[in-house]
Amino acid sequence: MMKKRIFLLLLIFCLGLGGCGKKEEQTKKKTTATEEVGIASKDAMLTLSMRIPETLNPLLNREETVDRILKLLFLPLLDFDESGKACPAVAQNWEFSADGRSLSMNLNSNIRWQDGTALTADDVVYSVNTLRNAPEDAVYKQVMNYVSGCSKTGTNSVVITFRDSFSSNIDALRFPIIPAGYYSGQSDTNTKPVGDGPYEMESYQQASEMKLKASASYYGSTPQISEIRVKMTAGEETDINAFEQGMTDVLVTNAMDAGKYADESVSGMHQFTSNQYDFIGFNFRKELWKDKSVRQAVAYAVPRDNLKESVYLNYAAMTNTPINPKSWLYEENVATYEYNPTMATTFLKNSGWTDADKDGKLEKEISGIRQSLRATILVNQENAGRVQIASKLKEELTAIGFEVTLDKVDFETYQQSLESGQFDLVVG
């Protein structure tokens, strides 16, 4: 029987309209594919890939592909279902204080580490402190923008304190927990992880391969797949080549590469919606965008259906807010702006923008001076999809009377321009 390989397609939800003013940090959120792919036999083996790790400590790790593998070895403090609601993991139950600034949590007393010791509150406190001292670009470091501390209140209970009373504080608690006794007393823990998840490390070959096996100490159900082999790769191109040559069984990819793997006799595609999103943002420091009618005109000029098809090959979910459409927080009943150039033109006209000299470009007298309707669109040139969006937006805005400059820059310059406010619109 031919082994059927799968690739997991990240569906981004795309093209909300937002504003860029004061910078706010956001916890990076991740989702994982949970769709069942047939039923594996007990002796089945799966081959995955990840980058060559600097460390296998999940709280110090800086690489997302490594994090995906480490999720098999370490349980998070809290898990989250497909709709974004918190579910038990290391924490069994929890309750917020009246002011929302602290969270009391009871831990699952049945969880044991793979060295045989029991998980306790000391491990949670140690994990938070480890994360506090982690590199700034560690995968879970942004958790500390929300969490201010963690204290032990019992053998299996802790209190998490937050910097502010914020509705999404609980979302920050998806970071993994590590055993204090092991990681505080060993010198070679970077390549010998001890976790509490469904798998444990069986062997490790530096810069080559890691083997995982189903963990005998895992408190939950025994995994259907008993062995996982993890190939270490240099980059995304290597991942793709390994999958195409049958060296790995799973490839996580995005909409841009989906068409390559449409032959379901060789591979099966299983889609999941990530929390990544592309958007068009206004720089509200600019006087132009203080006029709601002009902002509405831009919204009506965005051909979202066309972009969904041409840029994302229809592998995207559109949203009108920066919230995953599958989330329990997503609100359906909000104002929407379907593509309507005629409506866009009407809003500009009602705001006083006219084409007096019939050159196709709109002007307006402001403080006694005739000014043209101009906008600069900022986009980072490394992201081909966003460049396509920016180019199409330029075309559409030009058609309704804007003079548009497309500012395609490298990522470092892009970041600097965002910080300094040197843009009118941004595709991000």
Which sequence ranges carry the predicted segments?
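Aromatic- and charge-enriched surface segment that lines or borders ligand/interaction sites
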Residues: 92-136, 288
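Extracellular/periplasmic solute-recognition and catalytic clefts
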Residues: 50, 151, 202-211, 229-286, ...
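Surface-exposed binding/hinge segments that line
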Residues: 95, 140-183, 203-205
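Append "and occasionally in soluble cytosolic enzymes with long acidic Gly/Pro-rich linkers
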Residues: 290-395
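Gly/Pro-rich hinge or "lid" segments in bacterial periplasmic/extracellular proteins
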Residues: 81-82, 173-227, 232-237, 341-346
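C-terminal motif of bacterial Sec signal peptides marking the signal peptidase cleavage site
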Residues: 17-19
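Periplasmic binding protein-like
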Residues: 47-48, 398-428
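N-terminal lobe/hinge region of extracytoplasmic solute-binding protein
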Residues: 49-96, 129, 194-195
